[in-house]
Each structure stands twice: as C-alpha cells, then as structure tokens.
C-alpha cells in the first residue's frame, strides 16, 4: 500500500490527475474504471482541461456500479453523472464509454477479462466504509463478483444496484483511493489500520498489491506516513 497525504483537496485532486494521466499517456489501450460523486469533481475539472484538444482515443472508460436510468436518460444514474462531470466536458467519444448496466452485470466480469482487466479503478470512500455499492452487512468479502443488490433508501423506497464485488475489484491492476475531508478521517483510519471486517468493506482493499491512497491532511489526521 502507498499512502500519499496532500495539503488540501486541491492538491489531492492534482495528484490524482497525475496518476490518471500517467496511465492515459501510455502508447496502448488504457482501461479506466472511474467513480462518480462529490470527491472527484475537481479531478474531472482539471483532467477535462488537460485532455481537450489532445488525442486520447486509446483511453476507454467504465463504471463499477450502476442503478436504473432516471427519467429519459440514456444511461443509469452513475454514468449520467459521469457524463455531466467529465465525459461531456472532455469531449470523450461515446464509443470509448463502456457502461456497466442493470442488463449486462451478469456477463461483466467475463467482459472485463476479455479486455485485459482495468488498468486503474479510481474510487472514493463511503462514510460508512463502503466501496462501489458494497455496503456494510452485504457479505461483500466472500470473493464475490459483479452482482445485483437491493437497498431500502429513505427517500426512494427500495433501489437496486449492479456493483462490482470484491473479487472483481481486486482483479484490477491498480486501485486508486481518493479521500478528503475531516468527516472521513475516522473511517479512513478504520480502513487502513483496523482489521478486515465486513462492517467496514473497504478494509479489504489494503490486501491489493498495488493500492494507492491519496488523502488530504484533514482526512489523514489520524494517520502517519
């Protein structure tokens, strides 16, 4: 495991972009599985500026969890957000976007194997320690592949999510974990220092041989380099 502690959110975002561009600039096909949400917002702003006007047709994008499309959207919730946050701003060719969906999740792992695995999975840390849609108490540490989960949501009733499981995620060549803010400090300490526990699903990720954590000082306040 490699821990990179940055001064603030801006620097965390800049460092994450450097990791992504380091992979994207390879003279070969590059497979990036990326996260939606609030944490990567600045990452995508910076990255979109850097890729505009340059040829990154070798880079292909994927998501690691998804739910049903809302309204008349072409994509599910995750991919719709990624489109808004990054794909549209970076003018990514739709042919380079390969969504995990509620329809293809059962064949997703075979598909990922066929493309040569993901070069990077970039993900954030849930406040309850979840990764992808693997929440505490979902038996997520039992070598599970991509699967369908149902959750009772306070405002939306029961929702279903397709999500990559532990085995699927651990097959990636590199896991890039982005964490910011003091509100994530306690759970990040639990992930990195505590035992591997299903009540803190992300704790299993530290077993990956190429696991990089980029955290700002606020999130890393209980850690030492």
Residue spans for each PLM region:
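N-terminal glycine-/serine-/threonine-rich phosphate-binding loop
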Residues: 1-32
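Glycine-rich N-terminal segment of FAD-binding domains in flavoprotein oxidoreductases
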Residues: 28-50
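Short beta-strand segments
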Residues: 33-37, 63, 122-125, 177-180, ...
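Short glycine-rich anion-binding loops that position phosphate/pyrophosphate groups of nucleotides
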Residues: 38-39, 125-130, 182-183, 219
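A glycine- and small-aliphatic-rich helix-loop capping segment at beta-alpha/alpha-beta transitions
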Residues: 46-56, 84, 136-145, 196
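Ligand-binding beta-strand-loop-alpha-helix segment within the catalytic cores
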Residues: 55-122
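Class I SAM-dependent methyltransferase SAM-binding "motif I" and its flanking Rossmann-like core
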Residues: 121-167
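ATP/nucleoside-binding phosphotransfer catalytic cores, i.e., glycine-rich phosphate-binding loops
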Residues: 173-225
